[in-house]
Regions:
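Ser/Thr-rich, low-complexity intrinsically disordered terminal regions
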Residues: 1-117
Length: 117
């Protein structure tokens, strides 16, 4: 299955992205990205994480969740509490950066590194 990721900004605080990967790979990528950001997290259920993440030097609270779909996994990143003074465009950039970090991790691990082997 070769399905391109499809991102849909919901509002400035939320982004949904359908990734062409199995749910377990997306969950693993979330753990790896949270570790890379040095972020502590709370696992709310089997599909949702809450975390304080510093993006571009601004620490904000995010919800990151996954939902398995017929053709991949839907990743939803929502900024629950922005850093004080963060503009709407700053919020959108931060949400996009977190979603892109997860997507890029998956691409690197499952696509690019496989080609190098």
């Amino acid at each position: 299955m070769n399905v391109a990721p499809h991102s849909v900004p919901q509002d400035s605080n939320t982004m949904k992205t359908t990734l062409p990967y199995n749910r377990k790979y997306v969950l693993f990528a979330i753990y790896e990205v949270l570790d890379k950001f040095g972020s502590k997290y709370e696992k709310m259920d089997s599909s949702t994480f809450l975390s304080e993440i510093s993006v571009y030097g601004n620490k904000s609270r995010f919800s990151i969740s996954v939902d398995e779909q017929p053709f991949g996994t839907e990743l939803t990143v929502t900024m629950l509490r922005p850093c004080e003074g963060l503009s709407d465009s700053g919020i959108q950039r931060s949400v996009t950066a977190v979603a892109d970090s997860i997507s890029q991790y998956l691409e690197n691990e499952l696509e690019i590194n496989r080609l190098k082997a």
